[in-house]
């Protein structure tokens, strides 16, 4: 039961298999979703979307002191270990300039989502302060409910409504505001049909019923946009030029390695001074994020000194 998961960041709290007894003690409702695998081991019924939601609730309570967490039906129920990996690798990136991870970093989460997952992890692990942007009223209401239900989070996480669905940073980053980093889990499909096909494929792999869509659900803005992931990130790169002196590092997940070459070309055309790729692995799943800055080494050091 103590086998290490391959590839997770060394500081990730989910290095080992889930301690289901401890998680059930934290969140008793998880108990009703435990099953026996063909090998006779106890596990969570991952084909049941309510089980996945209960597991997330237990993980957030047990490891990140989130005592109240819920999401509305139809929104993404994110895998916590993978989301934590992004936060830890981002911390390493922010620590490279000065040699230590900043304790008071300010982070912009583009598309914070109904689950508010990145701020919840980042606040607990590093004491960072987050601004979360969101185009969906329902998602924003859900995230705000999570923040208000947990003591102390309202001082560390603020939400801003993106009124222009075609904009990413514009309207969110205000004049005279400065961020150590932005992060984003972009929509990766290029159409609603492609998003449905991807969700259906995942459900089939788990033997899940068609109507049980919670853990592979997601609203339009979470799953797809015109032109897919590449088009979305290219727009992000183009917009980032406007805020080149207000943000130290712009970052985003990239779901497919084959999407990297056109993004690298866009970054070169935009005048990015430095581009970094961080590879991540959660079990068999490979993922990555790219980061870019418009500041050289001296400018990055001065930015941090002024901001602190």
Swiss-Prot record:
- Looking at the keywords, is Disulfide bond present? no
Q: Which principal EC class is assigned to this enzyme? A: transferase
UniProt superkingdom: Bacteria
Q: EC no.?
A: 2.1.1.181
- Any GO molecular function: 23S rRNA (adenine(1618)-N(6))-methyltransferase activity
Q: Which GO terms describe its cellular component?
A: cytoplasm
Q: Which InterPro entries match?
A: METTL16/RlmF (IPR010286), rRNA_lsu_MeTfrase_F (IPR016909), SAM-dependent_MTases_sf (IPR029063)
Membrane as UniProt keyword: no
Q: Name one Pfam family in it.
A: Methyltransf_10
Where is this protein found? Cytoplasm
Chemical reaction(s) catalysed:
adenosine(1618) in 23S rRNA + S-adenosyl-L-methionine = N(6)-methyladenosine(1618) in 23S rRNA + S-adenosyl-L-homocysteine + H(+)
Give GO terms for biological process. rRNA base methylation
Which keywords does the record carry?
A: Cytoplasm, Methyltransferase, rRNA processing, S-adenosyl-L-methionine, Transferase
Q: Which NCBIfam families match?
A: PRK11727.1 (NF008725)
Tell me which family the UniProt entry assigns to this protein. Belongs to the methyltransferase superfamily. METTL16/RlmF family.
Which HAMAP family does this UniProt record tie to the protein?
23SrRNA_methyltr_F
PANTHER family on file: RNA N6-ADENOSINE-METHYLTRANSFERASE METTL16, SAM-DEPENDENT METHYLTRANSFERASE
Function, as annotated, reads: Specifically methylates the adenine in position 1618 of 23S rRNA.
Full protein name: Ribosomal RNA large subunit methyltransferase F
